[in-house]
């Protein structure tokens, strides 16, 4: 028979999550799902998907970069389309391992929806510390802009996609702006994103105990480097200029607890930023990625709305005149 304390803990967690959903229901949009129960309007996805061409791995870093880094590029076959959206995609792995292969399925799904996808490597900790991984993403955006004409990319419709530590990096990129400490020295207007799809996002590094992954990434403990922890936390960089965010997160995530998503979502709403939170009930960190299809469908539908030519979010990011 299960221990009464265990039952109480899980009931408390479920009731707290249900209460949170009721409280937040009036701002933004929350989906709560179970496996096999998709909460997605299929009309928001392209019904006719595109084939795509897979390029050989492309080096995106300049010759003087500390490490050679490559990107996997998929070009959708979209005859008659003058310019199409693009997606910068970043894998997870605790900032220290894994690679673009983990995100290949998501990249293919985006390419089928008409996005040029750029699925990148980045430098790993502990050899390289924050903010060097962010610099890799900023360089990838510069490289993507330099290839925009060749690949028929509309640079005002580039979105960011990531999971776990990749979601952290892509969110930091989205919030770094064109000025300030996160923008120097490789940032600028070219790093603007039209929207973000982020799963399992560690949004506030100050919430973690001094575990190896975060300490290796920052290069010290919270007590030793509190300013760096704050600067590296997307939740502490939100302004009303943030692009729209679609977040998905497992409600039973023990590695990156769900309050990283719910608090981030609340902060976005407080700034008037369009956002959606897709809670995967009963899923942990890795299960939320392995069984992600309905969340990704919902996320891509959200991205599709943001990259429409008349999107309000696009007008906010790229005002005319």
Residue ranges: model-predicted function:
Residues 142-210:
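Primarily recognizes the serine-hydrolase "nucleophile elbow" in alpha/beta-hydrolase
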Residues 33-80:
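N-terminal cap/lid segment of alpha/beta-hydrolase-fold proteins
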Residues 128-149:
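Alpha/beta-hydrolase active-site loop
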Residues 205-237, 243:
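Mobile cap/lid helix-loop segments that gate and shape the active-site cleft of serine hydrolases
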Residues 101-118:
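Short amphipathic alpha-helix adjacent to the substrate-entry channel of hydrolases
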Residues 83-93:
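Short beta-strand element of the alpha/beta-hydrolase
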Residues 248, 258-321:
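C-terminal catalytic histidine-bearing segment of alpha/beta-hydrolase fold enzymes
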Residues 247-249, 253:
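Short beta-strand/loop motif that positions the catalytic acidic residue
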């Amino acid at each position: 028979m299960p221990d009464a304390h265990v039952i109480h803990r899980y009931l408390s967690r479920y009731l707290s999550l249900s209460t949170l959903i009721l409280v937040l229901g009036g701002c933004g949009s929350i989906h709560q799902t179970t496996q096999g129960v998709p909460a997605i309007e299929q009309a928001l996805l392209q019904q006719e998907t595109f084939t795509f061409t897979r390029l050989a791995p492309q080096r995106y870093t300049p010759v003087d970069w500390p490490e050679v880094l490559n990107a996997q590029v998929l070009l959708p076959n979209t005859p008659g389309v003058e310019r199409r959206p693009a997606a910068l995609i970043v894998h997870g792995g605790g900032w220290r391992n894994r690679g673009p292969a983990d995100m290949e399925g998501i990249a293919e799904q985006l390419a089928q929806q008409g996005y040029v996808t750029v699925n990148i490597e980045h430098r790993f900790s502990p050899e390289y510390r924050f903010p060097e991984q962010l610099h890799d993403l900023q360089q990838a955006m510069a490289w993507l802009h330099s290839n925009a004409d060749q690949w028929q990319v509309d640079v005002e419709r580039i979105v960011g996609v990531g999971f776990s530590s990749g979601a952290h990096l892509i969110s930091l990129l989205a919030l770094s702006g064109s000025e300030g400490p996160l923008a120097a020295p490789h940032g600028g207007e070219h790093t603007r994103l039209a929207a973000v799809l982020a799963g399992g996002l560690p949004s506030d590094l100050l919430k973690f105990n001094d575990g190896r992954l975060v300490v290796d990434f920052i290069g010290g403990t919270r007590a030793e480097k509190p300013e760096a922890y704050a600067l590296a936390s997307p939740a502490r960089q939100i302004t009303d200029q943030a692009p729209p965010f679609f977040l998905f997160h497992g409600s039973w995530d023990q590695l990156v607890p769900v309050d990283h998503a719910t608090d981030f979502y609340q902060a976005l709403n407080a700034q008037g930023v369009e956002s959606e939170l897709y809670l995967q009930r009963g899923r942990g960190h890795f299960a939320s990625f392995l069984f992600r299809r309905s969340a990704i469908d919902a996320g891509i539908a959200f991205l599709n709305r943001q990259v429409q030519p008349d999107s309000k979010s696009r007008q906010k990011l790229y005002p005319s005149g």
